[in-house]
Amino acid sequence: MKEAAVERHFVWAVERAGGKTWKFKSPSNRGVCDRIACLPDGSTWFVELKTKGGRLSELQKLHAADLVALNQNYACLWTTEQVDQWLLTTTR
C-alpha cells in the first residue's frame, strides 16, 4: 500500500470520528510531520504517515523528538489498521 493510500484513510477516519485534519507543510523546515489532526476531545496531534516498512529520516526523528520534548501529541502510523487503532485509543 502506498503512503498516499494510508494518508487518504487517515483523513477519512479522522473526519468520520468528527475531527479535522490538515496537510502540514513548512517550506523552510524539511522533515516536519505530514498532518495535524484536531480531534473532538480537544486534543491536537502531529502525525507522520508512512508505508509499512517505511523509515523515518534522521530529520523526521529529530522533529518527532522535539515535539515529544515539548509535551505535544505525536504519532507515526504505518498502516490503515494502525490508523484505526490509533483513533480508537485517542478518542475514547
Please tell me what each predicted stretch does:
Residues M1-R92:
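Catalytic phosphate/metal-binding cores of nucleic-acid and nucleotide-processing enzymes, i.e., regions
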